[in-house]
A protein has these predicted regions:
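C-terminal terminal-subdomain/extension
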Residues: 63-112
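Compact nucleic-acid interaction/catalytic patches
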Residues: 20-26, 31-64
Length: 112
């Protein structure tokens, strides 16, 4: 994916690699920062349509506009880093209401 197209609150499909294998699965994520460093590391928040969210996770109110196929949850408690090259395709963006909820959750999680 072209770095120019990656900005916070973009929803992308990303490769999630298994720790002890070359295998991966493709999952939607919310870009939570700008690419950083020589390896172009990007903070991402995984998205899931599965029930069982933690209290800090955010139920996306406008999931369809974000390019998602099902009602979904931003798994804020599982924020992680991936390489820019593992972002495969932009599928949408998070609206202002959901952005505010995610920002509040990140502030609580990271004690900012």
């Amino acid at each position: 994916m072209d770095q120019i197209g990656v900005k916070p609150y973009t929803v992308c499909l990303a490769k999630f690699r298994f720790l002890e294998s070359e295998q991966f699965k493709v999952r939607p994520v919310i870009v939570a920062g700008h690419p950083y460093g020589t390896r172009q590391v990007v903070a991402v928040i995984p998205i899931s349509s599965s029930a069982g969210a933690e209290s800090i996770d955010v139920v996306l109110q406008n999931w369809q506009a974000a390019g998602l196929l099902k009602a979904s949850v931003a798994r804020v408690h599982r924020i992680s880093a991936t390489l820019l090259k593992d972002l495969l395709e932009e599928i949408g963006s998070i609206d202002k209401i959901d952005q505010a909820a995610i920002k509040a959750a990140l502030k609580e999680l990271l004690i900012l």
